[in-house]
Design a protein with these regions (language model features):
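Conserved catalytic cores of phosphodiester-cleaving nucleases, focusing on short active-site segments
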Residues: 14, 35-37, 44-54
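Short, charged, amphipathic alpha-helix that recurs within catalytic cores of restriction-modification
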Residues: 56-85
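Short acidic/glycine-enriched loop/turn segments that link adjacent beta-strands
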Residues: 29-32
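Short, solvent-exposed loop/turn segments that connect beta-strands within catalytic domains
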Residues: 40-44, 77-80, 92-95
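Acidic-basic catalytic patches of nuclease active cores, encompassing PD-(D/E)XK
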Residues: 1-26
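Domain-level recognition of nuclease-like catalytic cores that cleave nucleotide substrates
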Residues: 1, 82-157
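Acidic-residue sensor for enzyme active/binding pockets
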Residues: 7, 49, 64
């Protein structure tokens, strides 16, 4: 449910932005990115994997990154093609079952680096991204995407 709302929010923000179109692509049972956003004037396409939650870290499985990459590769007519990992840390942090603590709502839109090996990865509340290989975490230097709409992105952590 939360994931759906976050995807819906992203789509609505793009739709309110001039020259952008965005769509939710489907259910979790189908191997599609969560959101597809295009700007034909700027020849730009984003495939977006959206994650939201109340924990201190949000994981993205490797296969979800892979399917986003597969999708943008099929749209070779676009000059700018990027996979974005969109993270929303809700303003309530879950401490225990049914127990929450207030915190700042944070959003991060990270650009997947296509030169990297595709791995499971995780984004932390401070906006750092780590790959997870055989249980070991390694920090990844993924750039923050400047979105064409207003966000709760932090310019510096």
């Amino acid at each position: 449910q939360r994931g759906y709302q976050w995807e819906d929010t992203i789509v609505k923000r793009f739709k309110k932005t001039e020259n952008w179109k965005a769509f939710r692509l489907g259910s979790p049972s189908i191997a599609l990115p969560d959101v597809l956003a295009v700007n034909t004037k700027q020849s730009t396409i984003f495939t977006i994997e959206a994650k939201s939650g109340t924990s201190t870290s949000l994981p993205v499985p490797a296969d979800q990154i892979e399917r986003c990459l597969e999708w943008i590769k099929t749209f070779d007519i676009y000059k700018n093609k990027q996979v974005l990992l969109a993270f929303k840390f809700l303003s309530k942090k879950r401490i225990d079952v049914g127990v929450y603590k207030n915190r700042e709502l944070r959003e991060f839109f990270k650009i997947w680096d296509e030169t990297l090996e595709i791995t499971d990865c995780v984004c932390t509340y401070d906006g750092k991204i780590y790959s997870k290989i055989n249980g070991e975490r390694k920090e990844l230097d993924l750039k923050e995407c400047k979105m064409p709409f207003k966000t709760k992105q932090r310019t510096s952590a």
